[in-house]
C-alpha cells in the first residue's frame, strides 16, 4: 500500500474514533501526513469555553486544542499501538482566541524510541493565536 493510501486510512480512523475530551472541544481531524509528519485539526470554541463576558476562550481550553493534535499525530504515526502521555507542555498565548472555529497544526520536532518532542500552532482566521511545544512519552499498548 502506498503512503498516501496508508495516510488516508489513518485519517479515516482518527476521524471515526474520538474521545469524549476531544468531542467536548468540537474536534475534527482534517489532515494527516506521515511524511512529513503533520496533522491538522479543527476545533469549535463555544461560549461555555469563554470568560470576560464571552469574549476570550479560557487558556485551559486553548491548551487542550494544542495538546490534542500532537497526541493524535503520534497515535497515527504509530498505527494506534502507543499511548502518548504528555510529560510537559509549554504554551505561548499570542492573541485572544474567540468563539468559533480554530485550526491547530502539529508537527514532530524529534522522535526517539520512547520520547517525542512536538510542536503545535493554533490559528483563528489565519491569525496565530497560540503555540506550544511538548515532550511526550510513548507508552506501548499491551
Regions found by a protein language model. Give the residues of each.
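Terminal targeting signals and extreme-terminal segments of soluble enzymes
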Residues: 1-142
Amino acid at each position: 500500500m502506498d503512503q498516501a493510501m496508508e495516510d488516508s486510512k489513518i485519517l479515516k480512523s482518527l476521524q471515526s474514533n474520538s474521545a469524549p475530551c476531544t468531542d467536548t472541544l468540537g474536534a475534527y481531524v482534517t489532515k494527516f501526513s506521515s511524511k512529513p509528519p503533520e496533522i491538522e485539526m479543527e476545533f469549535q470554541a463555544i461560549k461555555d469555553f469563554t470568560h470576560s463576558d464571552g469574549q476570550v476562550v479560557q487558556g485551559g481550553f486553548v491548551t487542550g486544542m494544542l495538546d490534542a493534535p500532537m497526541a493524535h499525530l503520534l497515535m497515527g504515526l504509530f498505527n494506534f499501538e502507543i499511548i502518548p502521555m504528555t510529560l510537559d507542555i509549554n504554551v505561548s498565548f499570542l492573541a485572544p482566541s474567540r468563539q468559533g472555529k480554530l485550526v491547530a497544526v502539529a508537527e514532530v520536532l524529534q522522535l526517539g524510541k520512547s520520547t517525542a518532542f512536538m510542536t503545535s500552532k493554533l490559528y483563528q482566521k489565519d491569525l496565530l493565536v497560540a503555540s506550544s511545544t511538548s515532550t511526550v512519552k510513548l507508552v506501548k499498548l499491551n
